[in-house]
């Protein structure tokens, strides 16, 4: 679980996720501020269901995406690529995650957009601070692995 812990520590320090969905052979990507939960290994975000990506997602969809910093040198590149599923939350689950989201991003109190969960099944973390091209891999069905 050391790999997942390293990935989680880095993701908890970031705040913007890019995710992409597909429907009827059409792809679309979006960006959002997120809260990362290390226990569920999931991103939580707010996004309007009437947007192009919201309509393409529906209640649940396959998703792929990235989180990356903006380093000034190649030696400092760090970033995550993932694939998994995105779903719209409801009820107590939505209320609980909205409260956590608003705590991190207080301006979100003004938004009525639904809360979504991105649950990665696979994560690849590139971390050049550990050596050029160093990759850490995690799969939900396999636990932690390193490559």
From Swiss-Prot:
Disulfide bonds: none annotated. It comes from Klebsiella pneumoniae (strain 342). This is UPF0306 protein KPK_0562. Belongs to the UPF0306 family. It comes from the Bacteria.
